Design a protein with these regions (language model features):
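Sec-dependent N-terminal signal peptides
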Residues: 3-12
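Low-complexity, intrinsically disordered segments with a bias for serine/threonine
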Residues: 14-17
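Cell wall/extracellular polymer interaction/catalysis modules
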Residues: 19-186, 193-207, 211-222
């Protein structure tokens, strides 16, 4: 009975969000993880049911590997996002196991967006591109909360907050001067300032961001 229920739920999801799923597939998203994330987003941990994101941290940095899945509007868009400095080189993340003890790695699994403290928001409010001199003002950030037993540690590390935020090392200027590469964060998910507010504002508070290594189950890296 449980297997039948899961199958029926998957069929309903596929038909209800056909456009978003087709977009995700075309854009190179890991589809097993996308489907897993959609199921997870229905849990009581997430108040936002109309939008979620999947970050395939295993793809090269030069790929648009952060997939914003808008279920309300039945579409998916793909964006650049940086990984943590302990995940690997600027070109590609290659280390995923050990994230629970290395805080400079992006935590894997289901994360929930939440309101960031004023000091955090202020820190990333204005970003300047060190290559082009372009300045972005009025940028927003969201705190990230771990909702699984293996990533809830990020909720209680003294003096450390995990955030989804903008930074210049994901910008078009950086990408032009460093082909195929992005800068690296201190364990946060970092976005291109040009599209940061579109993503952060759409996710709001209470949305799922699922950080995955391709289609692999997260348990493989615990």
């Amino acid at each position: 009975m449980r297997t039948l229920l899961v199958l029926l739920t998957s069929i309903i999801s596929a038909s209800a969000f056909a456009g978003a799923l087709d977009d995700a597939r075309t854009l190179g998203a890991p589809m097993q993880s996308v489907e897993r994330a959609i199921q997870l987003s229905r849990g009581k941990e997430f108040s936002r049911k109309d939008v979620l994101a999947v970050f395939d941290i295993s793809q090269p940095s030069g790929n648009r590997r952060f997939f914003l899945i808008d279920l309300k509007n039945d579409k998916t868009t793909a964006h650049y996002a940086a990984h943590g400095k302990s995940n690997g080189s600027n070109l590609k993340a290659t280390k995923f196991r050990g994230f629970r003890s290395d805080h400079d790695m992006v935590p894997l699994g289901p994360l929930r967006t939440a309101a960031a403290d004023a000091s955090v928001v202020s820190h990333y409010r204005t970003i300047s591109d060190k290559y082009t001199g372009q300045v972005w003002n009025g940028l927003n950030s969201s705190r990230l909360e771990g909702v699984a037993s293996y990533n809830s540690y990020i909720n209680s590390v003294p003096g450390v907050v995990w955030v989804i935020h903008p930074n210049w090392y994901v910008s078009a200027g950086y990408r032009k001067n460093n082909p195929g590469a992005l800068g690296r964060s201190l364990g946060c998910i970092t976005l291109d300032p040009e599209v940061n507010n579109v993503i952060v504002n759409r996710l709001g508070n209470g949305a799922l961001i699922y950080v995955t290594v391709g289609n692999d189950p997260v348990e493989r890296y615990l």
